[in-house]
Amino acid sequence: MTGLPKSVEITSDEMMEALEEPLFTICEAVHNVLERTPPELAADISNSGIIVTGGGALMYGIDKRIQERTGIKVIIAEDPKSCVAIGTGKSLDILDKLESNALNRRAPYL
């Protein structure tokens, strides 16, 4: 070992194998959240699907793997690497409204 960085190529299959356990945990979390979600909202989620965001959404086959495990349609966001930052920025623009709404409704999930 030289201690210097080096590049290594791995296949999509090798990447998915390495992600088996974290994907299992994510899918279990989806099931747990849906169990605690009001039925009408859970039905909407089941009908509309799960939108996957972030750079990990670009990994080949991750949408199919999550869909197989949850039984819910999975959609990759249009711009998965940027959409979380864009949404956060939009939320900050209306932060007063969001806080007021959360306080007025005493929303248990916020």
Spans of model-derived segments:
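Helical "lid/coupling" subdomains associated with nucleotide-phosphate turnover
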Residues: 1-110
